[in-house]
């Protein structure tokens, strides 16, 4: 090919570049300059991106092939069950039409149609959807016929986005080194400045995964074209393949992974931020090396430790029955909504400091908007409203003096609302700029997650100074790729780095127990 040198197009391009430059100047004027520390953190993250992560190309290719074959089989089964009305797991619209005519005149029709119907909050328009939430709601019903249930299960199985990550791995991996570069985005998660991913979404890899030994067995089985259902006792091919995502990331020959993650980082950070007597009681459990999940269950009157675990993970930011049920599902716990409500009530009774903290945060945000440029302190957090910054910005100042910024903050019905999206829709767009309500639970969650991100940035900086080869990091996790003979040394060094409390976080008990892996795991 050759360049298009049409003079008119070149002039148009010049006009576009001028407008683009002016727009960037206008954006820059609205933003404060990055601090030296932020510039260093960005450089550290880019150095990690430059190292990249090595993938097992053969394993990813085999998994991709098996996923394609399974989708074909699922499509054939769908065609048989629906008399040809639906022939692929990608045909959600056809599935909705088929469902309607299957159930409209049956007792199960009303509950199913309620599951697949959503109401647009702005237009109040009723729309039908067959997304993950709708499928989960349908499968929870007791009135389904075997055929309807199987169709939903097929879509739930075949619609998994996890296996698509194998394609992303293969598309982004360097053909010579099999390493994927540039995945980690510095401060990509909006207000909290947590890291995010692009291309290959590392943050939402399935937690459940196979060990290196299981992966080797499964890889050899796929290499010879084995049947995973019979030879590997797999009930769901897609579920099995999803468990290969983490172990598809591997170290170079002669190297190991050293993986360290903080134990219950948010469950420690939240009470520490509250700077309360009740919060200190929770922190004392960690300081004493006791089991927070066991003690939480005991405090609520339950013998099952898992009940304590899901309560700690789901309820710290004001979550109620919905949040608890979502966490229960993730851990395979079944309870009714009534039982979940009892757990919520008991957790809040056992942790009154949390409710006090949520309410105090919400009150501070309201006071800040009513009294601009006045600082309000809650626990270890400070709030101030700056009316001339980005349409009026509520700022949360964290213990390390970094900030969370909530732009275009307004008081509405006694509650602070701010703009949610990073980019405002076009002027001719029908979409309004989405907003969010800054109630106490959201403020607590934002501060907790932002502080965890502060800790991670500081520890990545220290790893960089110590010349430790970080190849990947997630919200509470740091992954090193080290020579096999030095693995024990790096385990001890990474533990020291992660458990050393920064001066600005004095009193926060940190715990990390790095482990050695032949492949990336959990």
Question: Language-model features: where?
Answer:
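Conserved "right-hand" nucleotidyltransferase catalytic core of DNA-directed polymerases
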Residues: 1-241, 254, 266, 325-402
């Amino acid at each position: 090919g050759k360049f298009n040198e049409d003079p008119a197009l070149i002039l148009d391009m010049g006009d576009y570049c001028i407008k683009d430059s002016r727009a960037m100047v206008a954006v820059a004027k609205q933003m404060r300059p990055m601090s030296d520390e932020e510039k260093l953190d960005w450089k550290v993250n880019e150095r990690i991106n430059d190292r990249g992560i090595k993938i097992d190309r053969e394993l990813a290719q085999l998994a991709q092939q098996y996923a394609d074959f399974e989708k074909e089989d699922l499509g054939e089964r769908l065609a048989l069950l629906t008399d040809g009305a639906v022939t692929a797991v990608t045909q959600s619209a056809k599935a909705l039409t088929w469902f309607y005519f299957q159930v409209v005149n049956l007792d199960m029709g009303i509950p199913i149609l309620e599951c697949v119907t959503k109401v647009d909050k702005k237009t109040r328009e009723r729309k039908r959807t067959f997304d993950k939430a709708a499928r989960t709601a349908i499968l929870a019903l007791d009135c389904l016929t075997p055929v309807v249930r199987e169709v939903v299960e097929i879509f739930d199985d075949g619609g998994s986005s996890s296996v698509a990550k194998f394609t992303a791995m293969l598309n982004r991996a360097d053909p010579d080194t099999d390493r994927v570069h540039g995945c980690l985005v510095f401060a990509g998660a909006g207000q909290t400045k947590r890291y995010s991913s692009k291309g290959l979404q590392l943050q939402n890899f399935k937690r459940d995964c196979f060990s290196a030994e299981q992966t080797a067995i499964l890889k050899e089985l796929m290499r010879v074209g084995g049947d995973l259902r019979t030879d590997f006792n797999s009930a769901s091919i897609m579920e099995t393949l999803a468990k290969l995502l983490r172990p598809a990331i591997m170290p170079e020959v002669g190297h190991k992974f050293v993986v360290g993650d903080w134990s219950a980082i948010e469950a420690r950070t939240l009470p520490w931020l509250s700077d309360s007597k009740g919060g200190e009681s929770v922190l004392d459990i960690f300081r004493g090396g006791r089991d927070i999940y066991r003690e939480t269950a005991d405090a609520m009157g339950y013998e099952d430790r898992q009940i304590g675990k899901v309560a700690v993970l789901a309820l710290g930011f004001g979550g109620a029955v919905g949040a608890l049920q979502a966490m229960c599902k993730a851990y395979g716990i079944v309870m009714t909504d009534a039982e979940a409500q009892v757990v919520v009530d008991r957790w809040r009774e056992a942790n009154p400091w949390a409710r006090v903290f949520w309410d105090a945060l919400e009150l501070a945000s309201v006071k800040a908007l009513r009294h601009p440029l006045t600082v309000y302190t809650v626990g270890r957090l400070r709030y101030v409203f700056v009316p001339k910054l980005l349409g009026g910005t509520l700022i949360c100042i964290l213990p390390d003096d970094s900030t969370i910024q909530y732009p275009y903050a307004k008081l509405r019905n006694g509650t602070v609302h701010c703009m949610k999206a990073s980019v405002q829709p076009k002027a001719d767009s029908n979409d309004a700029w989405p907003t969010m309500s800054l109630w106490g639970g959201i403020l607590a969650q934002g501060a907790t997650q932002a502080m965890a991100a502060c800790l991670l940035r500081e520890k990545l900086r220290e790893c960089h100074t110590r010349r430790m080869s970080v190849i990947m990091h997630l919200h509470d996790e740091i992954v090193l790729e080290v020579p096999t003979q030095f693995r024990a040394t790096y385990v001890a060094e990474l533990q020291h780095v992660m458990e050393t409390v920064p001066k600005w976080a004095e009193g926060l008990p940190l715990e990390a127990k790095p482990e050695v892996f032949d492949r990336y795991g959990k």
